[in-house]
A protein has these predicted regions:
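Functional cation/ligand-contacting sites centered on basic and imidazole/sulfhydryl donors
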Residues: 1-81, 90-95, 102-106, 121, ...
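Surface-exposed, proline-enriched loop/turn segments that connect beta strands in immunoglobulin-like
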Residues: 86-88
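Short, solvent-exposed polar/charged micro-motifs at secondary-structure junctions
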Residues: 94-98, 144-146
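Basic, amphipathic alpha-helical patches used to engage nucleic acids or provide basic targeting signals
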Residues: 103-149
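Ampiphathic alpha-helical segments that act as solvent-exposed interaction surfaces
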Residues: 141-159, 163
């Protein structure tokens, strides 16, 4: 059985220009590398069996998703507890905070910018009575979500939910947004746009 027959859903991602072979000339278990092109125009090379059996997708889209996951997770859990969260707001410090929950005076950051900016953020948060939690994205989304729940618990915000289900909802919301960026499903995360940043309720 050829790829075109067994995995016809992947035909739209097969890069017909860069591949010498056609989907009708290879099988889903092949270890040959092929070129793929996602619906967003990203092109990448991957073994056919990685794409079919391991269900790996576009590396660029995956990196984008993982870079946004921490902020999306904070807004998702904030929304579950009826809390407003601001994503990427610079209104407090003059430099953007990745996520900020005003009612709790809580900022959660996953990335690390320039060391001087990080020192300045920590100092300015302390001066304003804002608790700054550094929670780097390590491991899987599930690991991060579990660690985030523990971080919330440390400030007496208790979230009891199925973490695997939470991660799936966050991932699906992200993919919906990628399909229709102009109609980002903000309401799913309890969010709305305000100027250059997003507020989540």
């Amino acid at each position: 059985n050829d790829l075109a027959t067994t995995d016809n859903q992947l035909l739209s991602e097969w890069d017909y220009e860069q591949n010498k072979l056609k989907p009708t000339e290879v099988s889903r278990t092949s270890a040959k590398r092929a070129w793929w092109k996602c619906r967003h125009g990203h092109s990448w090379s991957m073994k056919i069996n990685e794409r079919t059996i391991l269900n790996k997708g576009c590396r660029i889209c995956e990196q984008e998703y993982l870079s946004l996951f921490p902020a999306l997770a904070v807004s998702y859990y904030s929304n579950k507890k009826g809390l407003k969260a601001e994503l990427g707001s610079d209104r407090l410090l003059g430099v953007p905070l990745e996520t900020y929950i005003p009612s709790e005076k809580l900022a959660i950051e996953s990335g690390s910018a320039d060391e001087n900016i990080e020192i300045m953020k920590a100092y300015m948060c302390k001066q304003r009575g804002i608790r700054l939690i550094k929670l780097p994205m390590k491991g899987t989304e599930l690991d991060y979500a579990n660690n985030l729940k523990k971080a919330f618990q440390s400030v007496h915000i208790f979230i009891s939910s199925d973490t695997e289900e939470d991660v799936e909802i966050i991932k699906n919301t992200y993919h919906e947004w990628k399909l229709c960026p102009n109609t980002f499903p903000l309401q799913v995360m309890g969010c709305r746009r305000k100027g250059t940043y997003i507020i989540c309720f």
